[in-house]
From Swiss-Prot:
This is Large ribosomal subunit protein uL22. Belongs to the universal ribosomal protein uL22 family. The gene is rplV. One of its GO terms (cellular component) is cytosolic large ribosomal subunit. One of its GO terms (biological process) is translation. It holds the Pfam family Ribosomal_L22. The lineage of its organism: Bacteria, Bacillati, Cyanobacteriota, Cyanophyceae, Synechococcales. It comes from Prochlorococcus marinus (strain AS9601).
Amino acid sequence: MTKTPETTKKAIAHGNYVRGSASKVRRVLDQIRGRSYRDALIMLEFMPYRSTDPITKVLRSAVANAEHNLGMDPSTLVISSAWANSGPVMKRYRPRAQGRAFSIKKQTCHISISVESAPTETNAEVQN
């Protein structure tokens, strides 16, 4: 007989068409993945990157979804997964000398953050 995996409740939030490249957003997401909600907010507040503002907004939305839709306690939430995918690129042109034009690519990305309740000590003992 096979064991059925225990389903954990997850709340997810997306931020679409955020101005900024996906690689620069991933640099920040890699540092907060697996951390608690409170620790992630503190880290995001003091990081010197421009992408921390939209990431904070998406993280707060995911926690609000967990609290409102699933009735979870925000103090027990952990960032289970966070990723950023490339969005459409807006192409613009910058005029240069002698009638030339340099192309400017304005990157966008889609940010997704998933939060779930941290496993408590009693749950860990039951699973073992």
